[in-house]
């Protein structure tokens, strides 16, 4: 019962992220945390990296998160020393 509630919550969360048009453009919130911007179907590897770089991140990569989710585009922050 608990796992089905988690599944429903994750599906709902994914739908909100995917249906929100503002979530498709990466935003540098504080420049320190990786940011998930969408699925790799929406952002193929080349477009994922390019979108992240254009949004002031160091780069982006399609990564697999968990068993129930497909590959998602994650932007990695720039670190300044």
From Swiss-Prot:
Keyword annotations of the record: Antimicrobial, Disulfide bond, Fungicide, Plant defense, Secreted, Signal
Q: Which InterPro entries match?
A: Scorpion_toxin-like_sf (IPR036574)
Q: Which GO terms describe its cellular component?
A: extracellular region
Location relative to the cell:
Secreted
Cystines in this chain:
40-62, 48-73, 52-75
User: Sorted alphabetically, which CDD domains does this protein's record hold?
Assistant: DEFL_BmBKTx1-like
Tell me a GO biological process for this protein.
Answer: defense response to fungus
Q: Where is the signal peptide?
A: 1-26
The family annotation for this protein states: Belongs to the DEFL family.
Would you tell me the protein name for this molecule?
Answer: Defensin-like protein 32
Instruction: Give the organism the record lists.
Output: Arabidopsis thaliana (Mouse-ear cress)
């Amino acid at each position: 019962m608990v796992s089905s509630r988690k599944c429903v919550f994750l599906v709902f969360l994914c739908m909100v992220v995917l249906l929100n048009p503002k979530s498709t453009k990466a935003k540098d919130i504080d420049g320190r945390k990786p940011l998930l911007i969408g699925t790799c179907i929406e952002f193929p590897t080349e477009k994922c990296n390019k979108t992240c770089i254009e949004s002031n991140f160091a780069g982006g990569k399609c990564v697999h998160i968990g068993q129930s989710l497909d590959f998602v585009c994650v932007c990695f922050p720039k670190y300044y020393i």
